[in-house]
Amino acid sequence: MSLPSRQTAIVNPPPPEYINTKKSGRLTNQLQFLQRVVLKALWKHGFSWPFQQPVDAVKLKLPDYYTIIKTPMDLNTIKKRLENKYYEKASECIEDFNTMFSNCYLYNKTGDDIVVMAQALEKLFMQKLSQMPQEEQVVGGKERIKKDIQQKIAVSSAKEQIPSKAAENVFKRQEIPSGLPDISLSPLNMAQEAPPICDSQSLVQITKGVKRRADTTTPTTSIAKASSESPPTLRETKPVNMPVKENTVKNVLPDSQQQHKVLKTVKVTEQLKHCSEILKEMLAKKHLPYAWPFYNPVDADALGLHNYYDVVKNPMDLGTIKGKMDNQEYKDAYEFAADVRLMFMNCYKYNPPDHEVVAMARTLQDVFELHFAKIPDEPIESMHACHLTTNSAQALSRESSSEASSGDASSEDSEDERVQHLAKLQEQLNAVHQQLQVLSQVPLRKLKKKNEKSKRAPKRKKVNNRDENPRKKPKQMKQKEKAKINQPKKKKPLLKSEEEDNAKPMNYDEKRQLSLDINKLPGDKLGRIVHIIQSREPSLRNSNPDEIEIDFETLKASTLRELEKYVLACLRKRSLKPQAKKVVRSKEELHSEKKLELERRLLDVNNQLNCRKRQTKRPAKVEKPPPPPPPPPPPPPPPELASGSRLTDSSSSSGSGSGSSSSSSGSSSSSSSSGSASSSSDSSSSDSSDSEPEIFPKFTGVKQNDLPPKENIKQIQSSVQDITSAEAPLAQQSTAPCGAPGKHSQQMLGCQVTQHLQATENTASVQTQPLSGDCKRVLLGPPVVHTSAESLTVLEPECHAPAQKDIKIKNADSWKSLGKPVKASSVLKSSDELFNQFRKAAIEKEVKARTQEQMRKHLEHNAKDPKVSQENQREPGSGLTLESLSSKVQDKSLEEDQSEQQPPSEAQDVSKLWLLKDRNLAREKEQERRRREAMAGTIDMTLQSDIMTMFENNFD
């Protein structure tokens, strides 16, 4: 069988039926919730598109789909079934949802994209399903049954008269409730600041009183949402011509009971939502080790606690609290907290204080109290508004019930009474909404008063200085406009649910673009993004903002849209700033400016190179200390210094040659002066005067280059960090010769400072400067001199330019301090002491080895010549015995030790030194390592601050 014939063999079955031909479905409050809330939310989700239509096996080339999946299901079929009243109860609809998800999991593999999408949808489905009303009640059931009774009566009695009367009655009764939503909802839209809970309560209580005699009509959508009527009974299916008073009397008690039920299901405040989050936190797995005893009620029989219920009168546990929370039995957060605290008090009351369960209860109570303290308080105005609306609604319902009960049986009189009653209701509702507006304007007035008080002081100044400060008036106008704009923004949180419903879901490309835009934002803007997410996502509200993990797939569409607005606004501001700074210039001007800058830099570099070569040719007099006895090999230079010196040697061989040929006497080099600045006060004063003409032209070169200040500051900071990082490897030269270890380190630091100053000068220049002669001598031995006549002829005429200029620069002391190294006297002293101690130990070791060697030789000699030893033993006066030989050797070693231990610094016993040698060595090694670590992390902050102030002053 060929491939095309196989494809044609795949046939899609007919879609599932959505009209119930066997039995007529009914409409319940739970089915309404599934249709209006659950299905709507799933349909709007970004992952719902594969589930919105039946699976097309032909298009997707899935020949075995309908052989594996026996009962296919999709969202469109469920939607049609809900619209056509296919279901009798909500459990059938929920079963269809579960079938749709299980089909996806059955046919596809666990890691597929479609499975991940189905899991996300199922998670949303379960979240919405948890908000569904607990009790299922039929909506509009009375009307259907009474219509059937009317039709039976019409068939049995006069066929023409009674149907016409029934139709008239039904038509008249439909007119009045249809007007109710317009009357009740129009003023509610005017005052949106009242909480939605109070509105729903007032609607329920008002419409109950008016709807006494309109029970046989179909309820409108607003009434169906607010009140859920009980299923019809046989007593209510009596003939139509029953007196109105009996109907009203019978319906008073059930209606009042139903009102309380509706209030319980509707009244879910923000605090109770937080309480449910706290309960979930307490039942989480991370609290399992100390929360498990409180999950279920105490089983006194199984645990053998026969007197438990005598001591504990009101037992409580987390399972009972969760059941109450699911059934919405808590009116406010304080009832919830009272039950939780009662559970802990029962534990403390029954168990002894040192019991294990008491400790577990205390840890769990700490978790509860910590989270409960973070619950925000309810606004006082909304509570007042609730009380006002409920009181007025109760009064209206009493009046309406009394008027309805005292009404006549005739339909004309009842209609007139209804019209009058509705007019009264309209007036009273308007009065209530006016009170709500007054209450809502109270905080705004307080804010205005605060703003006025803060603005009084600048206003007084303006009266005195009207002519001096005319620019302040437009600023005040802007502030007033901002205040007016900010006032209506406070009403936005009440419309969050509408925004969430109306927000357009984001596709994959939009989410990817949003994540890229967020990454472009600076760090100070990210805090606002975290605040937006936490304020709109209840699951992330209690999370730590520093360690928050955000998944765009779990965020609501309204949150993503709000983030998109904020990010776009920030990026617009950033894009406008550089455009304002740009100045339009022609290409020729830019080229000419670049040429001028390059010429300036080349001139500065050449001048400074010539001056440096003059000074390096002068003989540098550095006093070298006498070499100590056994010098260990010095460690290799740091990588930064070595690489820098190689670069400068390779790049400036010709420059150094020209400088060596044309030498002049009379001044010392910059590196020697800066290196010996900290050794003595006399030399520091003379060297600072010599180093000034070298360092200052460098800075003028930087200024002439017109580099931006940020780059200069970064360069200087990097140079200072390099200097401080170079201190650690320099401090490791503690085992160097003891004569003058401080001078070597200071010379290397001075050379490094001059090298970094040259790097800051020539960042944009073409040539690089060579190091001074002393610096090369310290790092790489004696400098190699290359002579060339061409470089002499080129650079000699330009050498006189910087000598004639008299340059004055601010904060010269800060630049002097750059040449001075950081003091490391403590480290160097300790290194000298360490070297002396190591030297002592080595000498002692040599002495001991010598004595042992002599003893060994004598013993071997005696073993080889036994005759000599016997003769010596027989003639004690004539020869030496072994004892005398050993005693002589010991005497010699003691004399040597005493001669070596004669100085006061070595006045310790040899035996104690040998015992404590290993311990002292380990201790000193550890101390040295710690000192090196401490010195590696130190940074001269005063040096950095001086450099920063210098740059700021010169760029002003």
Curated annotation (Swiss-Prot):
GO cellular component terms attached to this protein's record: nucleus
Post-translational modification: Ubiquitinated in a SPOP-dependent manner, leading to proteasomal degradation.
Tagged with keyword Ribonucleoprotein: no
Ranges spanned by the short sequence motif Nuclear localization signal, renumbered to the chain: 208-219
Ranges of compositional bias, category Polar residues: 216-231, 714-724
Segments of this protein annotated with the region Disordered: 210-239, 391-420, 442-508, 607-747, 859-934
Positions of the record's site feature: Histone H4K5ac binding: N108, D113
Domain NET residue range list: 496-578
Keywords: Activator, Bromodomain, Chromatin regulator, Coiled coil, Differentiation, Meiosis, mRNA processing, mRNA splicing, Nucleus, Phosphoprotein, Repeat, Spermatogenesis, Transcription, Transcription regulation, Ubl conjugation
GO MF term list: histone binding; histone H4 reader activity
Localisation: Nucleus
Cysteine pairings via disulfide bonds: none
Any further remark recorded for this protein: Brdt is a promising target for male contraception. Inhibition by thienodiazepine inhibitor (+)-JQ1 that binds Asn-108, prevents recognition of acetylated histone H4. Treatment of mice with JQ1 reduces seminiferous tubule area, testis size and spermatozoa number and motility without affecting hormone levels. JQ1 causes a complete and reversible contraceptive effect in male mice.
Function of the molecule: Testis-specific chromatin protein that specifically binds histone H4 acetylated at 'Lys-5' and 'Lys-8' (H4K5ac and H4K8ac, respectively) and plays a key role in spermatogenesis. Required in late pachytene spermatocytes: plays a role in meiotic and post-meiotic cells by binding to acetylated histones at the promoter of specific meiotic and post-meiotic genes, facilitating their activation at the appropriate time. In the post-meiotic phase of spermatogenesis, binds to hyperacetylated histones and participates in their general removal from DNA.
Protein name: Bromodomain testis-specific protein
Source organism of the structure: Mus musculus
Gene name in the database record: Brdt
